[in-house]
C-alpha cells in the first residue's frame, strides 16, 4: 500500500505541473521575462499538495476501530497501526474549537510535555499529525482508568495500593525532575494498561517550573487540590502534586475522599484547615505517610525525597523504580530531525544499540513492504513520514525492554516488558459464594461515633497510647470480591461529587468561609533566625519604604504590560467618556501637553514592583567619585539591572520581601538572557545596596 502511495504522489505532481503548462502552450508565446515571472508562481502550488499527500499517507497508516471518549476539544479513538499491528489512541483535536488563546496554549503544552517525557508510567506521545482542520496526537493506548477500577473493586489491600502509589509517585518525581508540575492529579487522569500498570495522562493544565517563579492559577479538581491552590496563594509547584498524591493514596486505601462536602465553601474550609479522619483499621505506616503529605503548610509538607525514604514506600519497591533512574532520562525523538542509532538505548553499548536498531528497521521493512535502504533513508530525512511514525512505535517497545529488564535483550522480540510485572489484584481474584447483600446505606457514620470505638479510645487515652498502637480492628477487613450496583454507584458519587467544578476555582468562589468552629490552632514557635531586615510595619508601609529607597537609589519603574488589559474596563466605568487622568488634569486647569506615558499608573499587582536600575546612577549617589576608571570599565557590559520585588505572606501577620533579578540590560538596549550571565555578584551588589538603604532612617 505504501509504495503505491509514493508512485501516486509522483504521478499526481507530474499531472499537476503539466496541467498548469497546458494553457500556456495554447496561448501566443509571451515574452521571455513574462515566462520567467509566471513559472515561479506555479512551484509553490506543488508544495501544499505534496504536504497534503504525505499527511494523508500518515493518517492512512492507522485503522480506526471505535471511539473511546469525547472531550471539550475533540474525540479520542482507538486505532491499529497497519505496519506494526499495535493499538494506539488517536486524540483528534478540532482547530475550530480552539477559539481562545488559552485553549490553544493548553493543547500546545500537552504536546510539548508529552514529547519531552519518556517514563514507563507516563502516557507516550508517538507523533503528531497536523492538518488544516485538525491536530491528531498518536498516543500510547491504555484501556482502563484507576477511577473505574476503584468503583468496581472498592478499597484496596495494602500491597495493591502501595504498588499503584509507587508507580504514580515515581512518574511524578520524573516530571518534577524535568521541571514539569502536573497540577491535576486525580484517579480519572491515571490510566491503567492491560497489566494494571499506572499511566499518567492529561498534561493540559501542567506548567513548566522556573527558578524564582511561583504559580497562582487555581486549576484541577477541588477535592484533590491543595490548600494554597484553592486559597489563591502563590505556590512553587511540586508541593501541590504531593498533596494530590496523598489524597489519591487515601482514596486507594479507604475508598472515599478525605475532604468531601456537597457545599463548596464548606469543602474549601475543610481543605484549608486540613480536617479529615483516618480510619482505625488503616495500616500504621500508610497512615503516617498520609499525615506527612496532607500538611496544610506547604513548607512543612513532605517532599518527594521524604516519601522515597519512607519505610512504607520502599517496601517491595521494584528494581526499575529504585534510584538512580538515569535509564528514563531519554527525551524522545523529534520527527522533524534525523533519527540516530544511539537514540534507542543511550546507556547501552554501541553494539547493542546497533543490534536493536537493526531489529526495529528489519521489522518495519517486513511489515510495511519497504526495502531496508529505503527505511534508513527515511529515518535520516529531516521531515516527518509514515516510516518514522512506525519506527517510534516499535522503538518504544524496545526501549521499555532495555530500560526495565536488561535481560530482555536475550528474550524473543515479541515479549512484552510489562508481562513480568505482577498484579496484586490477581492474587485475590478467587471468587467466593456470598449471601445477597442488603441495600447499601447512603448515610456515613464516623467510626468514632460507635460505642465500641469510643470506649476503646477513652481507655487508650487514659493509658497514654492513643497514637502509639492501633486499636483492635472491629470491622472485618476482608475486602469483598463482588460489589453490588448500589455500592458502585455510591463509590462513584463519593469520589467525584464536584465533577462540574473542575477549573478556575478562584473564579467559582472567593476565600473559604468557616462554617463551624474548629479546634483552635496550636501556638507556633517564633522563628529564631531569618535573612533580611526585621520590621514590624504593615505590608503597605513596608512597600512605601521600598518605594522611597528605590527613588533615592535612582531606580525607575518599568510600565506594567498587563495594566491596560486588567484596568481598561475599570477606567471606562469610573470616568464615563474620558479617562480619570484627563478629568483630573482638567479640574486642575492643566494643559494636555503632558506626555500620557509619563503619567503615573498603578501596577496591575500592587504587591509586585518591577524596576530598572541604572548602575551609573547608583555609583554617583553612593560612591561619588571614588570609583577608578578600571572599575568603571568592568561595569560597562551592563548599564542597567532589571529587578522584580514582591512581598509574600508566609503566615498570618508574617511577610517576606523577595528580590529577583529579571535580567541585565546592555548599552545597546538588549536584555541578556539568564544563561548569558555567569556571575551573580552584580545582582547581589544591588540587593545589598537596597537593604542598606532600607536600614537607614529617613
Swiss-Prot record:
It comes from the Eukaryota. Its EC number is 2.7.11.1. Residues 484-493, 564-573 have a biased composition (Basic and acidic residues). GO terms for cellular component: cytoplasm; nucleus. Residues 360-397 form the UBA domain. It catalyses: L-seryl-[protein] + ATP = O-phospho-L-seryl-[protein] + ADP + H(+); L-threonyl-[protein] + ATP = O-phospho-L-threonyl-[protein] + ADP + H(+). Keywords: ATP-binding, Carbohydrate metabolism, Cytoplasm, Kinase, Nucleotide-binding, Nucleus, Serine/threonine-protein kinase, Transferase, Virulence. Residues 1-48, 410-435, 482-525, 564-597 are annotated as: Disordered. Pfam families: AdenylateSensor (PF16579), Pkinase (PF00069), UBA_2 (PF08587). Residues 62-313 form the Protein kinase domain. One of its GO terms (molecular function) is protein serine kinase activity. The active site is at residue 184. Residues 320-417 are annotated as: Auto-inhibitory domain (AID). Residues 415-435 have a biased composition (Low complexity). Disruption phenotype: Impairs the expression of the galactose oxidase gene which abolishes galactose utilization and causes poor growth on xylose, arabinose and sucrose. Impairs severely the ability to cause sudden death syndrome (SDS) on challenged soybean plants through preventing to colonize the xylem vessels and phloem tissue during infection. ATP binds at residues 68-76, 91. The keyword ATP-binding applies. The regulatory domain (RS) also called auto-inhibitory domain (AID) inhibits kinase activity of the protein kinase domain (KD). The ubiquitin-associated domain (UBA) localized within the AID dampens kinase activation, probably by restraining alpha-gamma associations. Catalytic subunit of the AMP-activated protein kinase complex also known as the SNF1 kinase complex (Snf1c), a central regulator of cellular energy homeostasis, which, in response to a fall in intracellular ATP levels, activates energy-producing pathways and inhibits energy-consuming processes. The complex phosphorylates histone H3 to form H3S10ph, which promotes H3K14ac formation, leading to transcriptional activation through TBP recruitment to the promoters. PANTHER family: MAP/MICROTUBULE AFFINITY-REGULATING KINASE, NON-SPECIFIC SERINE_THREONINE PROTEIN KINASE. Belongs to the protein kinase superfamily. CAMK Ser/Thr protein kinase family. SNF1 subfamily. This is Sucrose non-fermenting protein kinase 1. It comes from Fusarium virguliforme. The gene is SNF1.
Amino acid at each position: 500500500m505504501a509504495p503505491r502511495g509514493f508512485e501516486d504522489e509522483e504521478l499526481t505532481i507530474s499531472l499537476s505541473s503539466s496541467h498548469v503548462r497546458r494553457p500556456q502552450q495554447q496561448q501566443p508565446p509571451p515574452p521571455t521575462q513574462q515566462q520567467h515571472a509566471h513559472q515561479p508562481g506555479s512551484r509553490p502550488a506543488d508544495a501544499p499538495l505534496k504536504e497534503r499527500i504525505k499527511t494523508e499517507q500518515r493518517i492512512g497508516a492507522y485503522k480506526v476501530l471505535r471511539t473511546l471518549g469525547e472531550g471539550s476539544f475533540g474525540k479520542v479513538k482507538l486505532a491499529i497501526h497497519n505496519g506494526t499491528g499495535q493499538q494506539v489512541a488517536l486524540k483528534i483535536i478540532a482547530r475550530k474549537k480552539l477559539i481562545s488563546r488559552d485553549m490553544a496554549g493548553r493543547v500546545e503544552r500537552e504536546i510539548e510535555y508529552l514529547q519531552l517525557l519518556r517514563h514507563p508510567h507516563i502516557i507516550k506521545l508517538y507523533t503528531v499529525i497536523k492538518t488544516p482542520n485538525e491536530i491528531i496526537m498518536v498516543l500510547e493506548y491504555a484501556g482502563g482508568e484507576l477511577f473505574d477500577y476503584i468503583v468496581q473493586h472498592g478499597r484496596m489491600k495494602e500491597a495493591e495500593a502501595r504498588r499503584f502509589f509507587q508507580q504514580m509517585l515515581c512518574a511524578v518525581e520524573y516530571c518534577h525532575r524535568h521541571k514539569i508540575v502536573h497540577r491535576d492529579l486525580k484517579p480519572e487522569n491515571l490510566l491503567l494498561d492491560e497489566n494494571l500498570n499506572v499511566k499518567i495522562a492529561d498534561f493540559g493544565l501542567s506548567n513548566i517550573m522556573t527558578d524564582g517563579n511561583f504559580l497562582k492559577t487555581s486549576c484541577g479538581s477541588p477535592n484533590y487540590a491543595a490548600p494554597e491552590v484553592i486559597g489563591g496563594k502563590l505556590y512553587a509547584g511540586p508541593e501541590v502534586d504531593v498533596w494530590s498524591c496523598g489524597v489519591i493514596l487515601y482514596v486507594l486505601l479507604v475508598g472515599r475522599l478525605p475532604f468531601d462536602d456537597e457545599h463548596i465553601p464548606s469543602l474549601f474550609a475543610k481543605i484549608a484547615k486540613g480536617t479529615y479522619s483516618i480510619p482505625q483499621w488503616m495500616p500504621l505506616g500508610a497512615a503516617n505517610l498520609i499525615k506527612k503529605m496532607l500538611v496544610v503548610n506547604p513548607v512543612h509538607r513532605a517532599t518527594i525525597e521524604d516519601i522515597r525514604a519512607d519505610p512504607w514506600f520502599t517496601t517491595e519497591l521494584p528494581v526499575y523504580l529504585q534510584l538512580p533512574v538515569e535509564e528514563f532520562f531519554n527525551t524522545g525523538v523529534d520527527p522533524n530531525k534525523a533519527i540516530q542509532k544511539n537514540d534507542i538505548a543511550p546507556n547501552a553499548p554501541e553494539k547493542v544499540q546497533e543490534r536493536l536498531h537493526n531489529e526495529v528497521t528489519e521489522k518495519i521493512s517486513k511489515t510495511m513492504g519497504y526495502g531496508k535502504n529505503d527505511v534508513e533513508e527515511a529515518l535520516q530525512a529531516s521531515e516527518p513520514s509514515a516510516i518514522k511514525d512506525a519506527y517510534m512505535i516499535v522503538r518504544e517497545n524496545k526501549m521499555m525492554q532495555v530500560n526495565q529488564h536488561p535481560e530482555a535483550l536475550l528474550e524473543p522480540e515479541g515479549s512484552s516488558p510489562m508481562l513480568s510485572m505482577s498484579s496484586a489484584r490477581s492474587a485475590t481474584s478467587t471468587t467466593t459464594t456470598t449471601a445477597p447483600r442488603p441495600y447499601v446505606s447512603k448515610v456515613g457514620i464516623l467510626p468514632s461515633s460507635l460505642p465500641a470505638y469510643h470506649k476503646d479510645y477513652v481507655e487508650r487515652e487514659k493509658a497514654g497510647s492513643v497514637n502509639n498502637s492501633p486499636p483492635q480492628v472491629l470491622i472485618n477487613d476482608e475486602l469483598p470480591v463482588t460489589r453490588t450496583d448500589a455500592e458502585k454507584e455510591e463509590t462513584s458519587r463519593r469520589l467525584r461529587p464536584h465533577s462540574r467544578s473542575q477549573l478556575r476555582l478562584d473564579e467559582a468562589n472567593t476565600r473559604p468561609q468557616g462554617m463551624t468552629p474548629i479546634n483552635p490552632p496550636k501556638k507556633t514557635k517564633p522563628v529564631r533566625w531569618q535573612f533580611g531586615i526585621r520590621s514590624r510595619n504593615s505590608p503597605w508601609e513596608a512597600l512605601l519604604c521600598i518605594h522611597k529607597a528605590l527613588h533615592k537609589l535612582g531606580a525607575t519603574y518599568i510600565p506594567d504590560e498587563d495594566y491596560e488589559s486588567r484596568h481598561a474596563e475599570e477606567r471606562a466605568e469610573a470616568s464615563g467618556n474620558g479617562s480619570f487622568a484627563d478629568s483630573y488634569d482638567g479640574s486642575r486647569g492643566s494643559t494636555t501637553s503632558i506626555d500620557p506615558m509619563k503619567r503615573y499608573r498603578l501596577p496591575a499587582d500592587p504587591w509586585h514592583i518591577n524596576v530598572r536600575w541604572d548602575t551609573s546612577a547608583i555609583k554617583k549617589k553612593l560612591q561619588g567619585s571614588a570609583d577608578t576608571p578600571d572599575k568603571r570599565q568592568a561595569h560597562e557590559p551592563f548599564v542597567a539591572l532589571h529587578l522584580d520585588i514582591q512581598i509574600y505572606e508566609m503566615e498570618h501577620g508574617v511577610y517576606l520581601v523577595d528580590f529577583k533579578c529579571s535580567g541585565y540590560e546592555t548599552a545597546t538596549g538588549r536584555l541578556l538572557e539568564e544563561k548569558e550571565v555567569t556571575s551573580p555578584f552584580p545582582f547581589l551588589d544591588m540587593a545589598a545596596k537596597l537593604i542598606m538603604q532600607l536600614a537607614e532612617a529617613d
